[in-house]
Amino acid sequence: MSDIKSLDDLKSVVGEAPVAEVAIAREPVRDSLGRSYATGKRKDAVARVWIKPGSGKVTVNGKPMDEYFARPVLQMILRQPFKVANVEGQFDVMATVAGGGLSGQAGAVKHGISKALQLYEPALRAALKAAGFLTRDSRVVERKKYGKAKARRSFQFSKR
């Protein structure tokens, strides 16, 4: 072993182990009705989402999307995963969402749709992951501290 002076010498003696770069082949996950199920979370909202092939109808808590999320911005948030994956109007979505406000609920449904899409069609995973839709947005409201008016705001200071 004393004849090994550099890293190249060591590699020639030991031999380089072949590095196996195997992409994991993911199988589509569907239930007996041909649907994919996923949960999405955002702030305090939790959404349970089922998707199946269809005409693009989105139902949230038993109501059409445009009735439950009246603001166009929230409707746009729900459509983002379909635009990124280039599958607009190909899936029906049935979601139940609870907790939080409307913005958090829209984010939770979007997260759930993204996760369900990649379970239904694993080939869409790369596009959804690149857009950041499969990552749980961990930002939540900061807690209020004692001795402060809010989380960070101090009480008014009076010099005299």
UniProtKB/Swiss-Prot annotation:
Pfam families: Ribosomal_S9. The keyword Transit peptide does not apply. The keyword Ribonucleoprotein applies. Gene3D superfamilies: 3.30.230.10. Keywords: Ribonucleoprotein, Ribosomal protein. InterPro entries: Ribosomal_Su5_D2-typ_SF, Ribosomal_uS9, Ribosomal_uS9_bac/plastid, Ribosomal_uS9_CS, Ribsml_uS5_D2-typ_fold_subgr. It comes from the Bacteria. One of its GO terms (molecular function) is structural constituent of ribosome. GO terms for cellular component: cytosolic small ribosomal subunit. One of its GO terms (biological process) is translation. PANTHER family: RIBOSOMAL PROTEIN S9 (PTHR21569), SMALL RIBOSOMAL SUBUNIT PROTEIN US9M (PTHR21569:SF1). NCBIfam families: PRK00132.1 (NF001099). Belongs to the universal ribosomal protein uS9 family. This is Small ribosomal subunit protein uS9. It comes from Cereibacter sphaeroides (strain ATCC 17023 / DSM 158 / JCM 6121 / CCUG 31486 / LMG 2827 / NBRC 12203 / NCIMB 8253 / ATH 2.4.1.) (Rhodobacter sphaeroides). The lineage of its organism: Bacteria, Pseudomonadati, Pseudomonadota, Alphaproteobacteria, Rhodobacterales.
